[in-house]
């Protein structure tokens, strides 16, 4: 049976860098940014694209979970449906970008898709550090990203992750090599590799 681990954290927390280290040892699936054609339009116009983009994310996770559900091993994901629902979609509802009716529809799909994540590894990072990393990597889709959004995202993560029983928190303000070594040691203990 598959054991799903999700790497969680705000934008710029080091998820992709960590995944690059982990994929040498484990089956890893990074966020399918190439499948998210609505990501850039969402960043440019959240009001218009919030709901369609969150559905696109949800369906991409459904596709991914369909391919891994029969794997008899550890599979590590860069984010998971939990964060789509509890972090991003909830924030968009709070901001009025997703209506209560759209949220109800989203939740009905989410509940029917029955996603399971066995462990969340949360990369806890100061939004200032994350914003600096975002500026340095200079991704086209993130050029309009605002610091205030990261702060709010961080607050949402802190509030929601504290409700999880199956979470391991890692200080991601440290250099990514140290973060990677910490996570590899954890996974080695958990997975006996």
UniProtKB/Swiss-Prot annotation:
InterPro entries with a match to the protein in the record: DCK/DGK, Deoxyribonucleoside_kinase, DNK_dom, P-loop_NTPase
Swiss-Prot/TrEMBL keywords: ATP-binding, Kinase, Nucleotide-binding, Transferase
Protein name as it appears in the record: Putative kinase protein 029R
Protein residues bound to substrate: 31, 43, 54, 79, 142
Active site: 78
GO MF term list: ATP binding; deoxynucleoside kinase activity
Stored SUPFAM superfamilies: P-loop containing nucleoside triphosphate hydrolases
Pfam families: dNK
Class of enzymatic activity (EC top level): transferase
Binding site for ATP: 9-17
Family, per entry: Belongs to the DCK/DGK family.
EC numbers: 2.7.-.-
Oxidoreductase as UniProt keyword: no
Keyword Glycoprotein: no
């Amino acid at each position: 049976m598959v054991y799903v681990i999700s790497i969680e954290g705000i934008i710029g927390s080091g998820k992709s860098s960590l995944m690059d280290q982990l994929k040498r040892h484990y089956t890893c699936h990074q966020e399918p940014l190439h499948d998210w054609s609505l990501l850039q339009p969402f960043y440019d116009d959240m009001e218009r694209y919030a709901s369609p983009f969150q559905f696109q994310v949800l369906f991409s996770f459904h596709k991914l979970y369909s391919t891994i559900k029969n794997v008899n091993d550890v599979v590590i994901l860069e984010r998971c449906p939990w964060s789509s629902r509890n972090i991003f979609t909830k924030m968009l509802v709070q901001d009025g970008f997703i209506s209560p009716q759209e949220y109800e529809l989203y939740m009905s799909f989410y509940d029917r898709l029955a996603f399971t994540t066995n462990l969340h590894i949360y990369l806890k990072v100061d939004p200032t550090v994350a914003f600096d990393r975002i500026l340095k990597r200079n991704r086209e889709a993130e050029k309009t990203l605002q610091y205030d959004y990261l702060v709010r995202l961080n607050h949402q993560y802190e509030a929601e992750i504290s409700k999880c029983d199956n979470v391991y928190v890692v200080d991601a303000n440290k250099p990514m090599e140290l973060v990677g070594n910490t996570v590899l040691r954890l996974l080695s203990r958990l997975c006996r590799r």
